[in-house]
């Protein structure tokens, strides 16, 4: 039941974040300010912290987003959304080892998670680990043979490696 609520919150957060792309940066900052004010009264609200982190990402405030995901993961170390997005934030900050750890922890919780496997493969390519990247992307293609994104990612890695 808790996991369903978490997934619903994740979907709602993503929908909110996707809808926010049409907003101006000023509107995003206003939403973020409102979230900060509400957080002052409900500092333990993980859902609100996840939303705040999503707005931080939209505004490219990587450090603030990371702090929110750190808080969520201290309270719920198996929060799938927080692990995934913190990995993304760490990657954007150039903290590849931390991003790799988050993707690997996520894959321990949800083996075969498509986005985490893809993120890890692309991270390894970016971090000059070509053998690991290619092995991981091939595993991804083998596990998801009907997924065009997996093939496109493998094609991108092959082009970068001049294969």
Predicted regions and their residues:
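Register position in tetratricopeptide repeats
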Residues: 58, 92-93, 126-127, 159-161
């Amino acid at each position: 039941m808790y996991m369903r609520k978490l997934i619903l919150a994740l979907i709602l957060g993503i929908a909110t974040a996707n809808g926010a792309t049409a907003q101006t940066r000023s509107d995003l900052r206003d939403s973020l300010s409102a979230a900060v004010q509400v957080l002052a009264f409900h500092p333990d609200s993980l859902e609100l912290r996840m939303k705040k982190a999503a707005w931080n990402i939209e505004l490219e405030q990587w450090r603030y987003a990371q702090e929110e995901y750190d808080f969520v993961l201290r309270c719920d170390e198996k929060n799938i959304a927080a692990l995934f997005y913190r990995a993304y934030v760490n990657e954007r900050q150039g903290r590849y080892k931390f991003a790799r750890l988050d993707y690997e922890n996520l894959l321990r919780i949800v083996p075969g998670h498509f986005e985490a496997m893809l993120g890890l493969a692309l991270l390894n390519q970016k971090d000059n680990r070509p053998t690991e990247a290619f092995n991981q992307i091939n595993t991804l293609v083998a596990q998801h043979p009907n997924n065009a994104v997996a093939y496109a990612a493998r094609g991108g890695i092959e082009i970068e490696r001049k294969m």
